[in-house]
Amino acid sequence: MPLAPPSPLKAFAAFALLFVVYQSAEGLGGRVLDNFAVQAALMVAALLGGWPVARWLGWRGYEAYGLDRRRTSFAILAAGLMLTLIVKGAALAAGLSAGIASVGAAPGAPGVLAGAGLVAGAALTTFIPSVAEDILTRGFLLRAIGVRWTGPAFVLASAALFTFNHIYRFDWGISEQARLFCCGLAYAAAAWRWRTLWGAVGLHWGYNLANALWERLSPVSIDDVVAGRWLTAVLHLILLAIIVALPRRAADDAPDQIPAYHS
């Protein structure tokens, strides 16, 4: 843990570096070159680049972003993952009952090995970008820059940054911006309440993983995209309420670095 927070200029430069690398994955790899390998390599670089950036800011490594190695933090990760998968199932049921989604032809069921490979591939390809974005939009604010946040201020700032980070969706309309902001509220609240970025990763990764598996395995399709976004926003507000209602992490179990810069 650094003895003092980094200067505003140094913190901004560190953030800008990670931001550019992260955005280049979709911008350069996905849109300009249309090359999945380049896109994947840049996303991995965005994740791995967090380590030298943290060192430059005076930290030992990924602890700068709240990615500690405590067993309870990994339990929080697993619980968040399961909770989001349940919420995604609730969204599916609500979408069907509201006429937002419909059931079509069922995709062919993969064999055991193919199915395991599909799940493993989906888990990996959603985990890396989820953690990279969580570092950028939540972990950086949570700990790395040393700001003395209050809980509501951190959650709002992180949700706004998460929404802004989707720069290629600015023209998708207000429904998408609202969906992103509500998702950001829930994910940031999890990171703050349990004093670990793994809380946010569990929810964020779970949501992305559920989407990836849904696209490949589910016969359900979204008929009203805009209504689907609003439904997702509402469900994430419910998820936010659940997070707030759950008990806080015990102070003696939270990572030591949190109290230094947080009220």
What annotation goes with each model-predicted range?
Residues 8-16, 37-41, 74-82, 119-120, ...:
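Hydrophobic alpha-helical transmembrane segments
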Residues 10-59, 67-70, 75-80, 230-234:
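Alpha-helical transmembrane segments in multi-pass membrane proteins
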Residues 28-35, 62-132, 142, 147, ...:
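Juxtamembrane helix-loop-helix connectors linking adjacent transmembrane helices
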Residues 31-34, 166-174, 222-226:
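Membrane-interface helix caps and helix-loop-helix hairpins in membrane proteins
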Residues 56, 205-263:
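C-terminal membrane module of polytopic membrane proteins
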Residues 132-157, 189-196:
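Membrane-interface helix/loop boundary segments of multi-pass membrane proteins
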Residues 154-162, 199-211, 259-260:
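Central hydrophobic cores of alpha-helical transmembrane segments
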Residues 175-229:
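Functionally important transmembrane alpha-helices
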